[in-house]
Amino acid sequence: MSSDLKRHSRTITDGRTRAGARAMLKAIGFTDEDLAKPIIGIANTWIETMPCNINLRALAARVKEGVRAAGGTPMEFNTVAISDGVTMGTEGMKASLISRDLIADSIELMGRGYMFDAIIALVACDKTIPGAAMGLTRLNVPGFLLYGGSIAPGHWRGKEITIQHVYEAIGAVAAGKMTDEELKEIEDAACPGPGACGGQYTANTMATVMEIIGLSPIGTAAVPAADPRKDSVGYRAGQLIMDVLRRDLKPRDILTRAAFENAIASVALTGGSTNAVLHLLALAREAGVPLTLDDFDTISRRTPLCCDLMPSGKYSAIHVDQAGGIQVIAKRLVDGGFAHGDAITVTGRTLAEEAADAVETPGQDVIRPLDNPIKPTGGLLVLRGNLAPEGSVVKLFGYERTYHRGPARVFDSEEAAMAAIVGGEIRPDDIVVIRYEGPRGGPGMREMLGVTSAIVGAGLGQSVSLVTDGRFSGATRGVMIGHVAPEAARGGPLAIVQEGDEIEINLDERRVDLVLSEEEIADRLLAWQPPAPRFEWGVMARYSALVSSASEGAVLVTP
């Protein structure tokens, strides 16, 4: 418990020498009474370029009301936000992962510059969540994340659809399985309003993670963006931050090794996005908590997959709310012994205490009981082998084949692979290789939802696999192996795969191998020459020079 709630902001607001600062703040409308109170930063990721974050301006207003009611003075600021869905399949997607670290930097800079006493970060689209968490952890002042909520599903010909179905329809049209008119109907119906993409894709995966890890108040994320209850969620969050400030509860108090294990278990139990691997590795680094790829595989092996959620399952994200919310997921984790129930959360209560308050909707089958899981192990697998010595990641739902040996179809960019798929050049049993799309090589490690959806839409989802040093959208399904490390641009074995080489994927043995002798692989690696950097100046060049391997979270490393 802290007795000085203004121990940071008084440096900005108090005393004769700060008259200039007060004069400028009064020009905005703040009064002496306002400036005598604790200053609460409202880090907003509102932006007008996507539905995911479009509701955050209105949500921020309710948060600020709650802060004022509880005795604080809110000050709102904004960060950048890049939409994966809007930029997918273009050069713009290279900015997405890079924005995660820029968001972290901007929140850190604002916190250090204005010396806020506490911070609430309003987040929604994929990279805003880990970026904000990383920034708060660096500052380590009282604070937490508030998720804007999921979009409602669209409806087309009697079934629920999401953005995933739009991308898969593009592939179906290219394969002659759907008309352009039907694609237009799906396009017009898939996204009916505000909110983040509506399956257990990356945004909802990370929103779940943040509640289970303890950095978001449990019971807030599952409330959909357009639901009238969201106003109350925002107001109560504004009140809660003042309580968190009084208790002096900081991110690094919450982000223990046990909390990270809980977070990984939540990804496994819900069939969450492989992007969670990158983001949790990066967040653990900021928190000073040892975490490796192997931890994800170990925890996933012992955690059942219980949530029947898109992209591979039946339900969209709003059904989690209807089933009882993330509290029910927490209860499954705690009751099954898959999570550390004594881990503290931002409310001051333990995960077990929060889970005990879960109110499950009778008869719901979105979050299955522990004695009837979709499959007994989680969806995340970490593969190694001579093609991925430092590791790679794949997400499974349970219906995919576990062994595939086939010829490599090699592409040095996402665009080249997409052209081959929509041009009908990919055949059953092919293994598509997309390289030079890693953190350094892209740069920015683009998501491949357009490619993977085109494969599925063309009817090849069960017969074609994909291997890449890029990454995947949370909406991806099928045997799609990403995050291959070392990446091709660092001279990883992916760089020396040739068209027609045999690749062997054995998911049961957690391996992905190039079927060549060690001598042949060594000779090819010796002869390999790195390509010229794709950017020579600006943020892309700087990122490419400083970014670490995907196996380390693709974080920026200080030279």
Curated annotation (Swiss-Prot):
SUPFAM superfamilies according to UniProt: IlvD/EDD N-terminal domain-like, LeuD/IlvD-like
Gene Ontology BP annotations: isoleucine biosynthetic process; L-valine biosynthetic process
EC number, UniProt record: 4.2.1.9
Catalytic activity as recorded in UniProt: (2R)-2,3-dihydroxy-3-methylbutanoate = 3-methyl-2-oxobutanoate + H2O; (2R,3R)-2,3-dihydroxy-3-methylpentanoate = (S)-3-methyl-2-oxopentanoate + H2O
MF annotations from Gene Ontology: 2 iron, 2 sulfur cluster binding; dihydroxy-acid dehydratase activity; magnesium ion binding
N6-carboxylysine PTM positions: K127
Binding site for [2Fe-2S] cluster: C52, C125, C197
UniProt keyword list: 2Fe-2S, Amino-acid biosynthesis, Branched-chain amino acid biosynthesis, Iron, Iron-sulfur, Lyase, Magnesium, Metal-binding
Cofactor binding annotation: Binds 1 [2Fe-2S] cluster per subunit. This cluster acts as a Lewis acid cofactor.
Active site (UniProt): S473
Cofactors, names only: [2Fe-2S] cluster; Mg(2+)
Binding site for Mg(2+): D84, D126, K127, E447
Entry-linked InterPro entries: DHAD_IlvD/Edd, Dihydro-acid_dehy_C, DihydroxyA_deHydtase, DiOHA_6PGluconate_deHydtase_CS, ILV_EDD_C, ILV_EDD_N, IlvD/EDD_N
NCBIfam families per UniProt: ilvD, PRK00911.1
Subunit-level organization: Homodimer.
Family: Belongs to the IlvD/Edd family.
Biological role stated in the UniProt entry: Functions in the biosynthesis of branched-chain amino acids. Catalyzes the dehydration of (2R,3R)-2,3-dihydroxy-3-methylpentanoate (2,3-dihydroxy-3-methylvalerate) into 2-oxo-3-methylpentanoate (2-oxo-3-methylvalerate) and of (2R)-2,3-dihydroxy-3-methylbutanoate (2,3-dihydroxyisovalerate) into 2-oxo-3-methylbutanoate (2-oxoisovalerate), the penultimate precursor to L-isoleucine and L-valine, respectively.
Record-given protein name: Dihydroxy-acid dehydratase
Originating organism: Roseiflexus castenholzii (strain DSM 13941 / HLO8)
Lineage, broadest ranks: Bacteria, Bacillati, Chloroflexota, Chloroflexia, Chloroflexales
Gene behind this protein: ilvD
